Amino acid sequence: MRLLTGFPGFLGTEFITRLLQQTDASFLVLVQEKFEELAKAQIALLEAGIPGATGRVRPVIGDITLPGLGLPAGFSLQGITEVDHFAAIYDLNVKESLARLVNIEGTRNVLDFARGLPDLRALHYVSTCYVSGRFGGTFLESDLEKGQVFNNFYESTKFEAERLVRARMKDGLPAVIYRPSIVVGDSRTGATRKYDGPYFVIQWLLRQGKSALLPRLGDPSKFTINLVPSNYVLDAMVRLSQQPSSIGQTFQLADPRPYTIGKIVDILARDCERSLIQIPLPKNFAKFAVSAVPGLEGWLGIPRGALDYFVHPTRYDTSETLRSLQGTGIECPDFSSYSKTLVEYMKENPGVRSKPLV
């Protein structure tokens, strides 16, 4: 039995889907009371779409921000062999208090819960590449505390949460850490439940005519942006989570060959069928304008927090991930090979949300 947090969120749901299809695993999914009906509907879809899935996913009302995960008195800890901790606040503009409550205290509560499980084999923790903050250079999978500064409270609280996980690992907790970079839709279908990252640029381009204006922050030939499709992240996690050699490891689920900002923008302009007119702007001026001019952030559709990633100084080493996935056929596809799919999905599905499920 596995206990999973972050249901019915996109990555958690898709992770369950793959394990139901590929293994005989069964799940307890921790669900906030306000999402109970949504979770039950999602479970019904899983059972209807996957042969043999009926009864293998059971919801339990709880909350990672509460001691003991808010589980009912007398909840049995027997038989839970793995914990999959997906739940987090992913919002670049999140307030510190909420980020700390969910990302740090929530993770602490999950770790305390896992420590009390008599049958635990592994805890699988979903972190982020951006625990790197604004580290200048190549950030290794073994790196964490490098004196970095952070763009926002999402990054800083995920950093603190990973510190907690690593401390428990040193004390003997069997755990695996996964660090996705910026996750976009499925490379084959474009499907996603949340638009952020490059989708802000796609949306901005599609709102304009054939000649589109786009602010240029910094040197677009100098900085890269690391994008990974959700199917790569999930396929990698499912495979790595079943390899005993993964215990104790950290895997950066990032594109090993990321494009520069300039190349990404050119690819998106091509796929949106727009010719670009780029206007150089200092990043700090752009952030000030978005913050200071009433309504500008909403009109642009680009959160001020996203602007930092147009001039992000960090590259991500993926050596351990590539070594562990060698021979499995699981590889990160080239962004240019699926970017058109992302654009078409967004055009056909304009109502997908851009806010986190909290």
What are these regions (language model features)?
Residues 137-138, 168-225, 230-235, 268:
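NAD(P)-dependent short-chain dehydrogenase/reductase
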Residues 116, 149-181, 186:
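Active-site Tyr-X1-5-Lys
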Residues 204-221, 283-330:
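A hydrophobic C-terminal alpha-helical subdomain
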Residues 85-86, 93, 97-101, 105-153, ...:
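Conserved Rossmann-fold NAD(P)-dependent oxidoreductase catalytic core, especially the SDR/UDP-sugar
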Residues 1-24:
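N-terminal Rossmann NAD(P)H-binding glycine-rich loop of SDR-like oxidoreductase domains
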Residues 239-302, 323, 343-358:
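Mid/C-terminal beta-alpha module of Rossmann-like enzyme folds, strongest
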Residues 18, 22-24, 317-358:
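Amphipathic terminal alpha-helices
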Residues 53-105, 115-116:
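NAD(P)H-binding glycine-rich loop region in Rossmannoid oxidoreductase-like domains
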